[in-house]
């Protein structure tokens, strides 16, 4: 698919932008290592069919990321899987929905920028040369950003790189930018309200405890209903 790009460096930070990201489920080593071949194939097929579309909006320091209207509950829930995210970079505030298995939490906290490590590695994504960057919190994340599009935004609330994130890889999903549209008018933003309210620190502790109790790393699938 092509990416619509028509944003100048001079005006990029004040543009009204709508981006569409596709997300595909990562087939983890744990899944590939399932001994029962029949069960392994069922799980892999379920993951391969788990394709999502997300919408990212950005305007005047406000940002949102949410799943599209084709949202379907496929029975798969992961630790740290995100729902809707809203960030006000002017007020340094964040409202983010995240799951721990099938329980929804609403993180309300001050926005803290990610600490990125930018590498010299490059690759081309949808015709754009991108640079690799990494960051880590409770889970490792790899971003491929494009300086030709100087918007410091990306999927899942990962912001702060000197170019839009064309691809974001987490242990659970890989997100790829498919379309970017320059909007004439500023979009409206929906602030998420559902979920048990916690701070980022409180969520990190709950997430770490759940990961430890399962005896596996973050990002692996916890519940599979068939």
Predicted regions: what is each one?
Residues 1-19:
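Bacterial Sec-dependent N-terminal signal peptides
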Residues 14-226:
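Extended soluble regions of mature proteins
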């Amino acid at each position: 698919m092509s990416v619509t790009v028509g944003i100048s460096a001079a005006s990029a930070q004040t543009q009204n932008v709508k981006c569409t990201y596709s997300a595909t489920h990562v087939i983890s080593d744990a899944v590939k290592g399932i001994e029962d071949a029949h069960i392994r194939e069922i799980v892999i097929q379920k993951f391969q069919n788990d394709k999502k579309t997300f919408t990212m909006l950005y305007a005047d320091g406000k940002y949102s990321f949410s799943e599209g209207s084709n949202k379907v509950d496929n029975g798969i829930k992961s630790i740290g899987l995100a729902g809707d995210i809203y960030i006000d970079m002017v007020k340094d505030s964040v409202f983010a929905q995240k799951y721990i298995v099938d329980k929804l939490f609403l993180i309300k906290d001050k926005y803290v920028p990610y600490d990125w490590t930018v590498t010299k590695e490059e690759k081309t994504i949808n015709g754009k040369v991108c640079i690799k960057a990494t960051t880590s919190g409770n889970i490792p994340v790899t971003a491929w950003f494009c300086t030709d599009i100087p918007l410091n935004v990306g999927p899942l609330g990962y912001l702060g790189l000197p170019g839009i994130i064309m691809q974001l890889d987490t242990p659970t999903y890989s997100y790829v930018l498919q379309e970017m549209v320059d909007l004439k008018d500023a979009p409206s933003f929906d602030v998420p309200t559902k979920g048990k309210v916690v701070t980022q620190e409180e969520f990190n502790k709950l997430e770490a405890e759940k990961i430890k109790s399962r005896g596996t790393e973050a990002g692996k699938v916890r519940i599979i209903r068939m």
